[in-house]
């Protein structure tokens, strides 16, 4: 069987031979393997999301909501050092998040002291207009909470939605033309646009996850970099 990026198996030092190169992804993966706590799928989801967002947004504090291990927040700082700090927020922060963070700091000492992990509700962090709000697979209506918080602060935002809840999210009457999940994401994009945002709609590779639609937004006419 091939090496599937969609696998939920943890990456460990046994996988180091799969990342023998000198690319940034190789270096990140090597650190993740040393930590021996992160599902393979989470590495690829975070990497593909972060690099697409960094092509558009620089600067600002990173706020990673429903962050899990907080890899996305840390990748944003690894990819571009113009963000001074990052906050990774989740109701429950996995104990192994600290293990992963130490492995990344060992490789990139400049991360030390710049990542804050908060085990708290997603609305516990005050959002600033200069922030970049991000979330990978915030389940169901949590994606809508992330968008609402970004819109209220006029902050930049990027979400990779999953687990679409047809009963609680808005498909906008579009389900006769497209599947419910796509209809809900279309309405999310339109909500950003209606709030005065410029939007970018992208996808990450489908072999990582079928829930691969990436929605990115910044206030139209505002600064993309901050």
Where are these regions (language model features)?
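Class I S-adenosyl-L-methionine
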Residues: 1-226
